[in-house]
């Protein structure tokens, strides 16, 4: 499934099966009407936004909106323009985005539970939580994954080669073959790009 990625980055061979399993689980989640939630800190927060961006709009494939929605839009002024330019999303929520909620909760309650609070608000049983922490020990991520377990949300972890506590909790562990944070993050980007490509290819067939 991901031979091209492994050919470019052969050090990923030991985690090939886990990457493919993550792709399969995300596809199953979307087929059942679920969504993907993503969180991380610092550079991993940027990765969270990046993943959501690739899923919510066209990446490499054309994504026409559903025909029934298009028909409804064509009944209204500017409907054709809207229908022709919107792209069908794969539902994703970056839990790093909601500054009003985040700042209010951080000010009023427990700072380390900020991602857990958002997961509680946005998540549903059967969703997937992509938890990114290069060390695998970020407290706010660990609290969120514990909540995810209780809610019936499957967890895919992105960490460095050690994995930390996060890899002990996650359902699918993606451990980048590096100890250094910046190198692990470089692997993470290549992996989640491939993940987004393969998920998109499953649902949309026509190249842009």
Positions of PLM-derived features:
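Short, well-ordered beta-strand core segments
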Residues: 129, 155, 172-174
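Generic N-terminal amphipathic, Lys/Arg-enriched alpha-helix
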Residues: 1-14
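Short, structured coil segments at secondary-structure junctions
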Residues: 88, 168-171
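Short, glycine/polar-rich helix-capping loops at beta-to-alpha or helix-loop-helix junctions
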Residues: 157-169
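Short glycine/serine/threonine-rich phosphate/pyrophosphate-binding segments
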Residues: 45-49, 112, 137-144, 166
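Glycine-rich, small/polar surface segments that engage phosphate groups of diverse ligands
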Residues: 28-122
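A charged, well-structured terminal subsegment
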Residues: 121, 182-208
């Amino acid at each position: 499934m991901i031979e091209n990625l492994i050919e470019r980055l052969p050090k990923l061979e030991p985690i090939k099966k886990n990457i493919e399993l993550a792709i399969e689980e995300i596809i199953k989640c979307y087929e059942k009407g679920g969504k993907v939630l993503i969180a991380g800190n610092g550079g991993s927060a940027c990765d969270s936004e990046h993943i959501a961006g690739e899923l919510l709009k066209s990446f490499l494939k054309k994504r026409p909106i559903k025909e029934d929605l298009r028909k409804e839009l064509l009944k209204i002024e500017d409907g054709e323009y809207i229908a022709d330019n919107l792209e069908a999303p794969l539902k994703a929520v970056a839990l790093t985005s909601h500054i009003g909620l985040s700042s209010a909760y951080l000010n009023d309650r427990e700072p380390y539970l900020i991602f857990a609070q958002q997961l509680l608000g946005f998540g549903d049983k059967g969703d997937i939580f992509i938890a990114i922490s290069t060390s695998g020990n970020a407290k706010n991520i660990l609290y969120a994954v514990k909540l995810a377990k209780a809610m019936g949300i499957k967890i895919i972890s992105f960490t460095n080669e050690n994995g930390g506590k996060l890899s002990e909790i996650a359902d699918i562990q993606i451990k980048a073959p590096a100890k250094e944070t910046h190198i692990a993050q470089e692997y993470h980007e290549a992996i989640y790009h491939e993940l987004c490509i393969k998920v998109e290819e499953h649902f949309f067939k026509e190249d842009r």
